[in-house]
């Protein structure tokens, strides 16, 4: 997947997950125990390392399924000199961060 294809997915919005991957995250644990993502990196499908700065956390919601406990963050980010809205998910039991990009 090229960076242009990633931006096509990001800018189109939608409900169907087109691309998801685990990411290396730098985050802050606040005094109240809440997490705040700061920046992350990931390898795209072409194995190119992409670095992303989190500019602002717009929303955070708790996700609870039968065996899954996670927090989903909607963030304003900067990648490749562009501001992009992204969803990040933190899985509590595995301590893993994931990035989700969507398309209609």
Regions found by a protein language model. Name each.
Residues 1-104:
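Cysteine-centric segments in proteins
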């Amino acid at each position: 997947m090229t960076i242009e294809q990633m931006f096509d997915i990001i800018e189109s919005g939608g409900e169907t997950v087109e691309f998801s991957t685990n990411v290396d995250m730098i985050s802050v644990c606040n005094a109240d125990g809440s997490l705040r993502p700061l920046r992350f990196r990931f390898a795209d499908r072409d194995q190119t390392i992409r670095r992303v700065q989190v500019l602002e956390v717009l929303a955070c919601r708790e996700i609870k399924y039968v065996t899954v406990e996670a927090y989903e963050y909607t963030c304003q980010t900067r990648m490749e000199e562009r501001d992009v809205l992204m969803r990040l998910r933190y899985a509590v039991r595995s301590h893993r961060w994931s990035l989700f990009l969507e398309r209609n």
